[in-house]
């Protein structure tokens, strides 16, 4: 689905994808066909003139909190989860470059053989040259989620919005899978999200976006063409922002 030549209001965005999205219909791992489809949508967005940062979770491979719940040391489990995000970043880089999109991976845990370290000024230069920058390994420290990493990078890179592509089409007042009466918000303010513990991102990520006035747009990336619709201000989504 093509995008308008100029997306209103956005010059630079950060797109956060949950790791589970990369599984496609599988139960584990990376579905390369599905990654290629998402990569095409990201390419279309970039071709519209947007500067794009990406952050991808690692839940399709390993989730630190799940490992800790099974008796692993929490810090060790979190580092394993960070490495999973690097694997996902490399998979997305490969898919994007097969489409002719120049892409760089920057990791908060240095691994010179496979990617660059996170260097803000270098990342800005990549974006200015039309490259996509994928940030991996969260914030580089345990006890922080990839959502917090996404919020940090969005603030650091002065992004106009943080788009969160998940398996759910927005933010609800209850779990729509358990409560058929759950209602989806069109817009909701940061403080309501925090006070009501709405499942958008973890509290530190929401607070960081609030403090830097970065809107959070939650939508389902599983529906083909949805990224284009959201960027055009259409489609089903929830926007988290300051109270009007």
Curated annotation (Swiss-Prot):
<dbReference type="InterPro" id="IPR015963">
    <property type="entry name" value="Uridylate_kinase_bac"/>
</dbReference>
<feature type="binding site">
    <location>
        <position position="172"/>
    </location>
    <ligand>
        <name>ATP</name>
    </ligand>
</feature>
<dbReference type="InterPro" id="IPR001048">
    <property type="entry name" value="Asp/Glu/Uridylate_kinase"/>
</dbReference>
<dbReference type="GO" id="GO:0005524">
    <property type="term" value="F:ATP binding"/>
</dbReference>
<feature type="binding site">
    <location>
        <position position="63"/>
    </location>
    <ligand>
        <name>ATP</name>
    </ligand>
</feature>
<dbReference type="GO" id="GO:0044210">
    <property type="term" value="P:'de novo' CTP biosynthetic process"/>
</dbReference>
<dbReference type="InterPro" id="IPR011817">
    <property type="entry name" value="Uridylate_kinase"/>
</dbReference>
<dbReference type="Pfam" id="PF00696">
    <property type="entry name" value="AA_kinase"/>
</dbReference>
<keyword id="KW-0963">Cytoplasm</keyword>
<keyword id="KW-0067">ATP-binding</keyword>
<feature type="binding site">
    <location>
        <begin position="16"/>
        <end position="19"/>
    </location>
    <ligand>
        <name>ATP</name>
    </ligand>
</feature>
<dbReference type="GO" id="GO:0005737">
    <property type="term" value="C:cytoplasm"/>
</dbReference>
<comment type="pathway">
    <text>Pyrimidine metabolism; CTP biosynthesis via de novo pathway; UDP from UMP (UMPK route): step 1/1.</text>
</comment>
<feature type="binding site">
    <location>
        <position position="166"/>
    </location>
    <ligand>
        <name>ATP</name>
    </ligand>
</feature>
<keyword id="KW-0418">Kinase</keyword>
<comment type="subunit">
    <text>Homohexamer.</text>
</comment>
<feature type="binding site">
    <location>
        <position position="175"/>
    </location>
    <ligand>
        <name>ATP</name>
    </ligand>
</feature>
<dbReference type="InterPro" id="IPR036393">
    <property type="entry name" value="AceGlu_kinase-like_sf"/>
</dbReference>
<feature type="binding site">
    <location>
        <position position="78"/>
    </location>
    <ligand>
        <name>UMP</name>
    </ligand>
</feature>
<protein>
    <recommendedName>
        <fullName>Uridylate kinase</fullName>
        <ecNumber>2.7.4.22</ecNumber>
    </recommendedName>
</protein>
<keyword id="KW-0665">Pyrimidine biosynthesis</keyword>
<keyword id="KW-0808">Transferase</keyword>
<feature type="binding site">
    <location>
        <position position="59"/>
    </location>
    <ligand>
        <name>ATP</name>
    </ligand>
</feature>
<keyword id="KW-0547">Nucleotide-binding</keyword>
<dbReference type="GO" id="GO:0006225">
    <property type="term" value="P:UDP biosynthetic process"/>
</dbReference>
<comment type="function">
    <text>Catalyzes the reversible phosphorylation of UMP to UDP.</text>
</comment>
<feature type="binding site">
    <location>
        <begin position="139"/>
        <end position="146"/>
    </location>
    <ligand>
        <name>UMP</name>
    </ligand>
</feature>
<dbReference type="GO" id="GO:0033862">
    <property type="term" value="F:UMP kinase activity"/>
</dbReference>
<comment type="similarity">
    <text>Belongs to the UMP kinase family.</text>
</comment>
<feature type="binding site">
    <location>
        <position position="58"/>
    </location>
    <ligand>
        <name>UMP</name>
    </ligand>
</feature>
């Amino acid at each position: 689905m093509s995008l308008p030549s100029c997306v209103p209001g956005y010059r630079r965005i950060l797109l956060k994808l949950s790791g589970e999205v990369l599984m496609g219909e599988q139960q584990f791992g990376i579905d390369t066909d599905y990654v290629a489809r998402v990569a095409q949508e990201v390419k279309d967005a970039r071709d519209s003139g947007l500067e794009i940062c990406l952050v991808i979770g690692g839940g399709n491979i390993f989730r630190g909190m799940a490992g800790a719940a099974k008796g692993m040391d929490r810090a060790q489990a979190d580092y394993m989860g960070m490495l999973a995000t690097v694997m996902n970043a490399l998979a997305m880089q490969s898919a994007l470059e097969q489409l002719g999109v120049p892409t760089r991976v920057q990791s908060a845990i240095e691994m010179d053989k496979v990617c660059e370290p996170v260097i803000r000024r270098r990342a800005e230069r990549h974006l200015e040259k039309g490259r996509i920058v994928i940030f991996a390994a969260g914030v580089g420290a345990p006890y922080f989620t990839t959502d917090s990493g996404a919020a940090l990078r969005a603030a650091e890179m002065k992004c106009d919005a943080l788009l969160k592509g998940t398996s759910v089409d927005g933010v609800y007042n209850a779990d729509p899978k358990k409560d058929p009466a759950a209602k989806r918000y069109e817009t909701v303010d940061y403080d309501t999200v925090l006070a009501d513990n709405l499942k958008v991102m973890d509290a530190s990520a929401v607070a960081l976006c609030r403090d830097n006035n970065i809107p959070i747009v939650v939508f389902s990336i599983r529906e083909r063409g949805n990224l284009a619709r959201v960027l055009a201000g259409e489609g089903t989504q929830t926007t988290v922002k300051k109270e009007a």
